Amino acid sequence: MTMLKLALFFLVVSLIAGLFGFTGISAASAGIAKILFVIFLIVFVVLLVMALAAGKAIL
């Protein structure tokens, strides 16, 4: 699975667990989703800076 699919999976798991009131599972899944979000954000910024430094078209 790609990291994006894992992030979406943990988001869905945390929402479902939240509906059923399993706060431990919900908090753990939400925590993993937050960590994956930060990782994706850092990778995006690094790649954006690299593309701008290389002078290549981004989109």
From Swiss-Prot:
Subcellular location: Cell membrane
Domain of life: Bacteria
Keywords linked to the UniProt accession: Cell membrane, Membrane, Transmembrane, Transmembrane helix
Membrane topology, from the record: Multi-pass membrane protein
Signal sequence, start to end: none
Keyword Transmembrane (UniProt): yes
GO CC annotation terms, alphabetical: plasma membrane
Segments traversing the membrane: 6-26, 35-55
InterPro entries given in the database record: DUF1328
Principal subcellular localization: membrane
HAMAP family in alphabetical order: UPF0391
Family membership: Belongs to the UPF0391 family.
Protein known as: UPF0391 membrane protein GbCGDNIH1_2123
Native species: Granulibacter bethesdensis (strain ATCC BAA-1260 / CGDNIH1)
Lineage: Bacteria, Pseudomonadati, Pseudomonadota, Alphaproteobacteria, Acetobacterales
